[in-house]
């Protein structure tokens, strides 16, 4: 994947501090991140969605969908594409708040695909090293905001939204992802847990409270009159 060119925007938060919204497929990350983007529009806070657009149309192929329908053939190319896309995120968007991160790509998705045998064991150490190297270019002091939701509810939400490329995702896979998320974030250094079974408004309010508490400078842009 060719790295994209362009100016790197200034950050709102101190260098190295990034809030990463994490959680299983279907837990509500995109909805939350879009709400935060609306709240801070024009304030200089860089809120960045997961770079799915770079995965669903790369050289004419939907690598996200292929990673589900043909994991043996596409799990490794897809994960490498994910890492490249996060390099572009850092260079062109320089996030203060971001949806997922290179760490979850390695600690969750690569680990699950390794356990399923679709990523060779010999490839895992190199992929983990690359993911963590990319992460260090984005954040040296990440705070993980973890949206907790049972995999059964994640599946119900996925089926309702019927997003392109997700038809091949089943409950067993979601359970594996959930287990890996729990194992990783139970021992991670800086994690804020959020009950994602609450209403959209309650989740947004809870996350705003966390962000303002963790860095008071975010209070002004996040507590302006809601545009939601």
Swiss-Prot record:
Residue numbers annotated as active site: 50 (proton acceptor)
GO-annotated molecular function: ATP binding; thymidine kinase activity
Positions of transmembrane segments: none
Annotated residues for binding of substrate: 68, 79, 109
Pfam family, one: dNK
GO-annotated biological processes: DNA biosynthetic process
InterPro entries, sorted: Deoxyribonucleoside_kinase, DNK_dom, P-loop_NTPase
Protein EC: 2.7.1.21
Swiss-Prot/TrEMBL keywords: ATP-binding, DNA synthesis, Kinase, Nucleotide-binding, Transferase
N-terminal signal peptide: none
Coiled-coil stretches: none
UniProt-annotated binding residues for ATP: 23-30, 157
Key word Transferase present: yes
Catalytic reaction list: thymidine + ATP = dTMP + ADP + H(+)
PANTHER family, per database record: DEOXYADENOSINE KINASE (PTHR10513:SF35), DEOXYNUCLEOSIDE KINASE (PTHR10513)
Protein family according to the UniProt entry: Belongs to the DCK/DGK family.
Name listed for the protein in its UniProt record: Thymidine kinase
């Amino acid at each position: 994947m060719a790295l994209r060119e362009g100016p790197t925007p200034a950050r709102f938060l101190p260098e190295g501090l990034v809030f990463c919204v994490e959680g299983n497929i279907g837990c509500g990350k995109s909805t939350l991140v879009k709400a935060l983007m609306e709240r801070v529009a024009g304030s200089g806070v860089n809120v960045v969605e997961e770079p799915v657009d770079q995965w669903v149309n790369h050289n004419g192929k939907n690598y996200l969908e292929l990673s589900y329908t043909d994991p043996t053939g596409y799990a490794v190319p897809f994960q490498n594409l994910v890492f490249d896309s996060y390099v572009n995120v850092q260079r062109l968007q320089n996030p203060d708040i971001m949806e997922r991160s290179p760490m979850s790509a390695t600690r969750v998705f690569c680990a699950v695909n390794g356990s399923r045998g679709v990523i060779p064991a010999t490839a895992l150490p190199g992929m983990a090293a690359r993911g963590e190297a990319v992460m260090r270019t984005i954040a040296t002091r990440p705070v993980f905001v973890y949206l907790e939701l049972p995999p059964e509810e994640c599946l119900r939400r996925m089926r309702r939204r019927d997003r392109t490329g997700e038809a091949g995702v089943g409950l067993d896979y979601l359970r594996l992802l959930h287990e890996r998320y729990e194992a990783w974030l139970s021992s991670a250094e800086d994690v804020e847990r959020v009950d994602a079974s609450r209403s959209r408004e309650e989740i947004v309010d809870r996350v705003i409270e966390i962000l303002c508490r963790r860095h008071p400078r975010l209070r002004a842009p996040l507590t302006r009159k809601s545009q939601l």
